[in-house]
Amino acid sequence: MVIFAPKYKSYIVMKKKNWMMSLLLMPLLAQAGEVTSPNGNVRVKFYTDGDGRPTYEMTYKERPVVLPSRLGLELARDKHASAGMDETDLMDRFTIVDEQTSEFDETWQPVWGETRDIRNHYRELAVTLKREWQKITSATQTGAIGQDLRFHERTIIIRFRVYDDGMGLRYEFPQQKELNYFLIKEERTEFAMAGDHMAWWLPGDYDTQEQETQQTRLSEIRERMQQAVNWGNSSVAVFSPTGVQTSLQMKSQDGLYINIHEAACADYATMHLELVDSQTKALTTKLEGSSNAYTPAPQPSAYPLPKPFTFVSHLTPDATGLKGAMQTPCSTPWRTVMVSDDARDMLSSNLILNLNEPCALDDVSWIHPTKYCGVWWEMIVGKSSWNYTDEFPSIKLEGDAFPNAKTTVVNYAKAKPNGRHGANNEKVKRYIDFAAKNGLDEVLVEGWNVGWEDWANMWKRDVFDFQTPYPDFDIEMLNRYAHSKGVKLLMHHETSSSAQNYERHMEKAFQLMNRYGYDAVKTGYVGDIIPRGDHHYSQSMNNHYLYVVKEAAKHHIMVNAHEATRPTGLCRTYPNLVGNESARGTEYEAFGGSRPDHTCILPFTRLQGGPMDYTPGIFVTRLSEWSDNTSWARITIAGSLALYLTMYSPLQMAADLPEHYERFDDAFQFIRDVPCDWDESIYLEAEPADYITVARKGKGTDNWFVGGKCDENGHQTTLKLDFLDKDKKYACTIYADAPDAHYESNPQAYVITKKTVKAGQTLKLKEAPGGGFAISLIAM
């Protein structure tokens, strides 16, 4: 037997005649490791408890962030595992056999981003653990002991990387005979909170993040859950009355901002969090029964229930109920905890990006930030339609996927147009002209391809071929026309969540894009997943989303994925992933609206993992002014302009109709001017759900842009221009709410002020309820 001394610099070899005695001694050893951040503010301790369970805790400036929390994985007994029905968990009876500490410091340049340079500076603790598991033979079961009890060693590594603003941990599984293939029943990573924190959370759901963020104490999550869920969403799978999604933003009573998320989620299921509260009897294991209700009576685990205010990881299952199929060598995503006593640090953190691998693409010259408009908003509102005809209750497409189809195939050339189809030649040319006139790069066109007549919520596998246009969409002519104007069309591939169908047609669809000069695609995954029974955030679907990004890169195509899994920083490794939706975007302003504080929360939560294609820029907020839709956007025009800065993305849409922007052409000037890529970003003030103010310096220029957005209470700010170059003067244009502006009663009231300013001056600004401001500072 080998027992390592506490510091693991040396070891003692001991021989025991009585192996039972040596086994009993193992959990009594003092085994611990510790690592601090480069500036010393963040401290992480690791040890095994009396049962040999891996345990960690975390502090910030000596204040508790994560109380002692256990780590481990429950594995499934299954014929597909290397150990088969003899499989055992990776939860306890571990011994620390090695501990390595190191420090790493680099500066790297993203292809696009909020800053030109990103520093990646951390200290690392890598702990190697060994576990012995036993196989009990029939002889043992009859009472004999000794040679019938066999032990098999398994080795795992738990790696901690500690930054000045938080830490990441992950499990690593070296290749080994006794742990080759294994199936995850559940990951049991704990995050024990030090109090009843205020939290900004979304209901834990395997299929959607398109919910409104809730703000409650941790102890109030259970009571709020039922009303927090948007049960009418096209795909809902809520798993627990205390389950929440990441990124989870919290604030302690003593003023610490704490965020739990994950980084580099690849070949693994998306992680949710299940809160243990005073009413918790057992942790949920998997979704059962209907597809939109949480498990009513979960069964107790063999392991002790954590204390109240502890979050426990909960992975998204596949159609079998399992959480992951793993082959060593492999690792989990990073589990991240960010912390600071300044809310601005939450927004400026690069921890998630830094925990991802460097860029995997040799050539990135074709990847670029994009500002675009599109044939989209009028369909969302209901003014136009995606489908070309209303003649048929359902359709079947012909082609390679349907060689033996006997059903009558729709002849679109003879079908009666419904007169509302948005993606028609005349309208698309109008958008191209608008983009060219106003310096926009691309025009998104949705509903261009056949199949939209019965596309949604039917669990229909063969719904689109992504290649055949409707009769009134001349794909060759329109691309030629766009290119003649210096504009490109932006492709749309709605999959209707049929991943099987998309993968079957993807190569030909990308070839078509290359043929006509498209360089970006917006993908969509509306509805329940096909293969049936799977979920949007399962291991297999996460692999699908990444497969799309990788295949697109081979064709020099950028990807903007909607309804896909929430981002975890993979855009560093694959920078052609330029956007995701993965939250409640502007489209919901046509579905009842979102609260004014919504966009003051998203940068603290959803945007932690990567940029969001929020599609801002709605100027005519009362939709009934131009359609039959009675919904309305809870924002002012000045607030809409602010979103181009506070909601960072290299892909920004001017989402409203061209004619609406023409009504407010002076305000639209800011959208013309604002870049989508930056050399520097400075968060000037921030508080979750209340307000955000940020200044950004345009990539490769001396120009600065400042945006401020607030909630329904309004906000006043004093803006010090200390970030400007002291040797320059700037032409300053301020787009602000008018004194009587209000998101509900007077959203289109704004004032534009122009002046010359220099560093050191101060601007005083008042943001209306639901409003904001935007400023351009052009170096003279």
Task: Show the residue positions of the predicted features.
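Aromatic- and carboxylate-enriched substrate-binding clefts and catalytic-loop regions
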Residues: 446-636
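N-terminal accessory beta-strand-rich subdomains and adjacent acidic, glycine-rich linkers
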Residues: 34-363
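An acidic-aromatic substrate-binding cleft motif
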Residues: 327-430, 438, 442
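Hydrophobic h-region of N-terminal signal peptides that target proteins for export
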Residues: 23-32
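C-terminal beta-strand-rich structural cap/linker in extracellular carbohydrate-active enzymes
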Residues: 754-780
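Catalytic cores of secreted or luminal carbohydrate-active enzymes
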Residues: 638-685
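Catalytic domains of carbohydrate-active enzymes, especially glycoside hydrolases
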Residues: 427-448, 513-519
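Carbohydrate-binding surface patches
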Residues: 688-730, 773-776
